[in-house]
Regions:
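DG-centered beta-turn motif at the end of beta-strands
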Residues: 51, 77-80, 111, 164-178, ...
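VWA/integrin I-like adhesion module and closely mimicked acidic/polar interface patches used
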Residues: 175-245, 249
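Von Willebrand factor
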Residues: 68-123, 129-171, 177, 203-208, ...
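Eukaryote-biased intrinsically disordered, low-complexity acidic regions enriched in Ser/Thr/Pro
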Residues: 22-81, 93, 98
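Bacterial N-terminal signal peptides
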Residues: 7-17
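Extracytoplasmic/secreted cell-surface and envelope-processing proteins
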Residues: 84-87, 118-122, 177-182, 206-210, ...
């Protein structure tokens, strides 16, 4: 009888030890968190205790928050499809110039054309090489007229080991998958390589779609802490269905820059249109250059899962509307 009791006690101790070991093995991980104002500028001054995170109604421990404005690596994927209008091409050129003009010391850029000719340029501080790349004939190293998502997948490999703030900016009319590259493949590659994707769309963007069934992509759940529209963001139930979930699930954002409303004329001869194009590109550059590096300790789950993040109500009551951009999949403990 005594032997059975001792055996039972030993099992209890063993199970408790394993549970403690599993809990102690939960190491905090760094996650890029963008908090922006209604006009797309970074929201500063937040601390760890101001954030509230949950996974399946279980709290996510926020261990620390640091404002990160260090050097960035930015890959630009530019659609050069001959079907694009002249105004769309002019807008694309203007956005690339704005992104480059917003660079800080230490920032490096790379560029890859999609759907047409042009030269691939790997990460460099030579802005002239980036701005001239799309006017080059190119030599078809990636095949004839590679698609946007095909190009993104190749570009992800260029980053190598992840560095803080790694980002991809896609300037394109759409993100249609190809026979060899699916949206799920791209979403997984972005997650695995800790890369945020931002979009400057040259067409209409659907904002009620999803890359995978387990990824929620309604406007209220894609990193927008409030229902007030951020500048340039509108809810559409038609248009490209991949731009929105791929960007927002990675912790980024997409702006519909051109051709979103068929009733409207998008002319780059209009100074107001030019200013709008520049402003959206500048907002993306700002989101890339500054963010909060959040250290979180997820609950003990065996696989990645969706999580929610918000700012406590007291902060929201006394601040202008803010929006939270964050990777929507949290790794397991």
């Amino acid at each position: 009888m005594k032997y059975r009791i001792l055996t039972a006690l030993s099992m209890v101790v063993l199970v408790s030890s394993l549970a403690c070991a599993q809990q102690s093995a939960c190491k905090a991980t760094d996650i890029p968190i963008g908090v922006i104002t209604q006009n797309g500028d970074p929201f500063r001054g937040l601390a760890a205790e101001d954030f509230i995170g949950h996974v399946q109604k279980r709290p996510v421990a926020v261990k620390g928050v640091a404002f990160d404005d260090g050097p960035r690596r930015v890959l630009i994927v530019a659609d050069v499809n001959k079907k694009l209008s002249a105004d769309s091409r002019k807008a694309e050129d203007e956005m690339i110039k704005t992104l480059l003009a917003s660079a800080r010391p230490g920032d490096t850029f790379a560029i890859m054309p999609a759907h047409g000719p042009g030269e691939d340029v790997k990460f460099t501080e030579d802005h002239a090489a980036i701005s001239q790349a799309l006017s080059q004939p190119g030599d078809g190293k990636r095949g004839k007229d590679p698609g946007v998502l095909d190009t993104v997948m190749v570009g992800i490999e260029w980053f190598g080991p992840p560095q803080p703030g790694d980002s991809i900016v896609v300037i394109a009319a759409d993100m249609q998958p190809s026979h060899k590259t699916t949206t799920k493949m791209v979403a997984k590659a972005l997650y695995d390589n800790h890369i945020r994707m931002f979009g400057l769309a040259l067409g209409r963007v659907q904002t009620t779609s999803s890359v995978a069934s387990r990824m929620t992509t309604t406007a209220s759940s894609q990193g927008l802490a409030e229902v007030e529209p951020v500048v340039g963001v509108q809810v559409y139930d038609s248009g490209d269905e991949n731009f929105y979930p791929l960007t927002t699930n990675s912790g980024g954002l997409v702006f519909s820059v051109m051709n979103a409303d068929p009733r409207r004329t998008y002319s780059m001869s209009n100074p107001q249109m030019v200013q709008s194009v520049r402003q959206k590109a500048h907002s993306v550059a700002s989101m890339i250059s500054t963010y909060y590096r959040m250290k979180v300790e997820p609950p003990a789950f065996g696989k990645p899962g969706d999580w929610s993040l918000t700012v406590n109500e007291e902060i929201q009551k006394h601040s202008q509307p803010m929006f939270i951009l964050y990777p929507h999949e949290l790794g397991p403990c």
